[in-house]
Amino acid sequence: MSEKEAGIEVQGTVEEALAGGMYRVKVDQGPTVLAYASGKMKKFHIRIIPGDRVKLELSPYDLTRGRITYRDK
């Protein structure tokens, strides 16, 4: 990814698991966003449940959607 398209890394807490592999995540320094699990998380069957702390990557073009890249222990 070029510098212009680099995502914004933030942390948050999963509030709700939605249909279709989507999650509602409350970002620490901001609003609630819709996020999905990254491909590697799906591949290795990493489960994400409400209450989990996660790292998100937000698109600079749409700050209301993101990709979950890491689930904290």
Curated annotation (Swiss-Prot):
GO cellular component, one term: cytosol
Major site of localization recorded for this protein: cytoplasm
InterPro entries tied to this protein: NA-bd_OB-fold, RNA-binding_domain_S1_IF1, TIF_IF1
Stored Pfam families: eIF-1a (PF01176)
RNA-binding among keywords: yes
Domain S1-like: 1-73
Hydrolase found in the keyword field: no
Keywords: Cytoplasm, Initiation factor, Protein biosynthesis, RNA-binding, rRNA-binding
GO molecular function annotations of the record: ribosome binding; rRNA binding; translation initiation factor activity
Location of the protein in the cell: Cytoplasm
Matches recorded under PROSITE patterns: S1_IF1_TYPE (PS50832)
Source superkingdom: Bacteria
Description of how the protein assembles with itself and partners: Component of the 30S ribosomal translation pre-initiation complex which assembles on the 30S ribosome in the order IF-2 and IF-3, IF-1 and N-formylmethionyl-tRNA(fMet); mRNA recruitment can occur at any time during PIC assembly.
PANTHER family: TRANSLATION INITIATION FACTOR IF-1, CHLOROPLASTIC
Primary role: One of the essential components for the initiation of protein synthesis. Stabilizes the binding of IF-2 and IF-3 on the 30S subunit to which N-formylmethionyl-tRNA(fMet) subsequently binds. Helps modulate mRNA selection, yielding the 30S pre-initiation complex (PIC). Upon addition of the 50S ribosomal subunit IF-1, IF-2 and IF-3 are released leaving the mature 70S translation initiation complex.
HAMAP family recorded: IF_1
Family classification: Belongs to the IF-1 family.
Record's protein name: Translation initiation factor IF-1
Organism: Anaeromyxobacter sp. (strain Fw109-5)
Lineage of the species this protein comes from: Bacteria, Pseudomonadati, Myxococcota, Myxococcia, Myxococcales
Name of the gene encoding the protein in the UniProt record: infA
